[in-house]
Design a protein with these regions (language model features):
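Two-component/phosphorelay signaling modules centered on CheY-like receiver
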Residues: 2-5, 13-32
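Receiver (REC) domain active-site loop signature in two-component systems and cognate sites
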Residues: 59
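Non-catalytic signal-transmission and effector/linker regions of two-component phosphorelay proteins
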Residues: 1-8, 13, 44, 49
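Acidic, metal-coordinating helix/loop segments flanking the phosphotransfer/catalytic sites
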Residues: 32-52
Length: 106
């Protein structure tokens, strides 16, 4: 079994990725994606190494909710916990993320 020492950061805003990189770069290997499609490609390739995914909701190409749907359909939520990072603090958004399999929401 491989060591899970990688964080996958998924956010279309570069500044958010830079901030998160700064928080975790000394302790973890980091992978970055700008949208959900890129995230799923990286996840399929490196899922055995990924300790956690930090996932934005609102992104172009494929949003975070669709990523959670795809992960659930492919059994990847059992392997990689997902923390949703979003400015949307609505109850509806939180419930949707949890219903789709998010481990937590920030």
């Amino acid at each position: 079994m491989r060591q899970r020492d990688t964080i996958l950061i998924v956010d279309d805003m570069e500044i958010n990725r830079v901030i998160l990189d700064g928080l975790f770069q000394e302790e973890y290997h980091l992978l970055e994606a700008e949208n959900g499609e890129q995230a799923l490609l990286l996840l399929r390739q490196y899922h055995e190494n990924i300790a956690i995914m930090l996932l934005d909701v609102v992104m172009p190409v494929m949003d975070g909710y669709k990523v959670l749907q795809e992960m659930g359909a492919n059994g990847l939520l059992d392997e990689v916990p997902v923390v949703v990072i979003t400015a949307d603090n609505s109850l509806e958004g939180e419930l949707r993320a949890f219903d789709l399999g998010a481990s937590d929401i920030i």
